[in-house]
Design a protein with these regions (language model features):
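RNA pseudouridine synthases
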Residues: 1-355
């Protein structure tokens, strides 16, 4: 698990601090400094002067490198199609990283208990604060990658591969739907509603729902995608079982914004809550969250469903999103004929339900 990085020469320079560099393809002709400026102008919302200053500092720091990791100069000339790389400081560098709990270790892979404070992979403003970077630093292995993803606020079982030669065999388990995923969730909606009866403990559900996600949208949409559109879509299916009900908290007056499921934000009003066991038969962005919200059981602490909260809404309230990847079950690639079952400890919010 502590194996050091051994990248093949000529493919990609080593990561720095667990963070991979950004790759570019040279169009040829101009100096490398001008090429990088032009390519960053298409990617960053900065002025020409700011980008020029950024590029100058990157060259001075040795952050622009060849595939072998050799620092390149501003006046370097590359042939069309040649690759070069840029090491960028993470926007959240210096953030405290929790120690990851290893739940299972197999041939070329581990399963960790993902905390809610980390994204799965480095992306956007969550770079250092990602499981991949945290694991690379904790185990001293820059080859670690995630075989699948969990939403940033979701906790629980996450499978990581440790070596490129094992990566495909684990990712294919997910692609071929050979991994059984079981989640715990806590939702509102236990009181029922005008159009439905209150769910009973032990009652099972088979939720089937078309959904799609438009580019740039934070939340998925329910229904068929617009005709002719090229958005990601799915005919989702989720099996649900009501494991228990939580004691009804003291009633309070409902505030403006009724429907808010996060106790730390305006509009939250207590009602009977449910503890669910969920098994997704398909895999789509926010599938479990969007499905339960659509059918009247929004997850406690969800900032997106059924309503999208403002970007500056506080996240440090308790409980946060009540969704936990409780268990992974899959055939062990390292031991043919053997099934691996990995279970993550139940979170605090899942305790206390009456069954």
């Amino acid at each position: 698990m502590g194996r050091r990085s051994k990248r093949r020469a000529g493919t990609r320079p080593p990561a720095r601090g667990g963070i991979d560099p950004v790759g570019f393809v040279s169009p040829g002709q101009e100096t490398l400094e001008r090429q990088l400026q032009a390519q960053l102008e298409r990617k960053l919302s900065l002025s020409t002067a700011e980008i020029a200053d950024f590029v100058a500092k990157a060259f001075a720091a040795g952050d622009v490198v060849s595939p072998l990791g050799i620092a390149l100069s501003p006046d370097s000339k590359l042939l069309e199609g040649q690759r070069y790389y840029l090491h960028r400081a993470a926007p959240d560098e210096g953030a405290a990283l929790p120690k990851l709990q290893v739940l299972w270790e197999g041939e070329g892979a581990i399963v960790v208990n993902k905390p809610a404070s980390l994204a799965t992979i480095p992306r956007g403003s969550w770079v250092t604060r990602s499981v991949v970077v945290a694991a690379r630093r904790q185990f001293g292995n820059d080859e670690i990658t995630a075989a699948h993803r969990l939403d940033r606020l979701t906790t629980g079982c996450l499978l990581l591969t440790l070596d490129p030669k094992y990566r495909a065999r684990y990712q294919q388990l997910f692609d071929r739907r050979q991994v059984k995923k079981t989640y715990l969730a806590r939702s509102r909606g236990g009181d029922g509603g005008e159009e439905r009866e209150a769910p009973q403990v032990g009652e099972s559900f088979d939720f089937q729902l078309p959904m799609f996600k438009e580019t740039g949208s934070l939340a998925v949409s329910i229904g068929a995608p617009p005709i002719g559109s090229k958005v990601a879509s799915c005919e989702s299916r989720t099996r649900g079982l009501v494991l228990g009900k939580f004691p009804l908290p003291e009633k309070t007056e409902k505030a403006e914004g009724e429907g808010n499921t996060n106790p730390g934000n305006p509009g939250y009003a207590p009602e009977e809550e449910l503890l669910w066991q969920l098994e997704p038969e398909s895999g789509f962005t926010h599938q479990l969250r969007a499905t339960l919200a659509h059918f009247g059981y929004p997850l406690v602490g969800d900032p997106l469903y059924p309503i999208v909260l403002p970007a500056d809404a506080p996240e440090n309230v308790e409980p946060q999103l009540c969704l936990h990847a409780q268990e992974l079950q899959f055939p062990d690639p390292g031991n043919p004929g053997t099934t691996v079952t990995v279970t993550a400890p139940a979170p605090t919010w899942a305790k206390g339900a009456l069954n």
